[in-house]
């Protein structure tokens, strides 16, 4: 199942997340890059992403792209990253039509989640 379908199924298709913040993170950090397409610019996506990432102690960055998509590069426990994705999908202002994902090697030297311009 692709990531976009997984997110929709996990939220029950109604944009209300059914998952909660995990009690304990997995011990091994992972880093992923996500490209979100749809109505994701001009709707506060970057600020919501930063807030959700901060709540989950995730690090990385988010940036608008010239093609109208938004790229998020995020690092932390895999189950916390899943909770981040559920939180993003639950925001009703966003109309996410596609998510592309790429696994990256962890950097392990970032200390915060930033908005890049």
Description of each model-found segment:
Residues 1-117:
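Intrinsically disordered, low-complexity, mixed-charge
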């Amino acid at each position: 199942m692709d990531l976009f379908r997984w997110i929709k199924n996990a939220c029950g298709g109604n944009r209300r997340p059914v998952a909660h913040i995990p009690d304990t993170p997995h011990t091994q950090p992972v880093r992923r890059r996500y490209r979100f397409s749809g109505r994701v610019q001009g709707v506060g996506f970057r600020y919501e992403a930063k807030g959700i990432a901060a709540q989950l102690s995730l690090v990385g960055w988010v940036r608008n792209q010239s093609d109208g998509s938004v790229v998020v590069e995020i690092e932390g426990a895999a189950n916390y990253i899943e909770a981040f994705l559920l939180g993003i999908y639950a925001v009703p202002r966003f109309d996410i039509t596609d998510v592309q994902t790429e696994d990256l090697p962890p950097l392990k030297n970032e200390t915060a989640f930033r908005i890049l311009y």
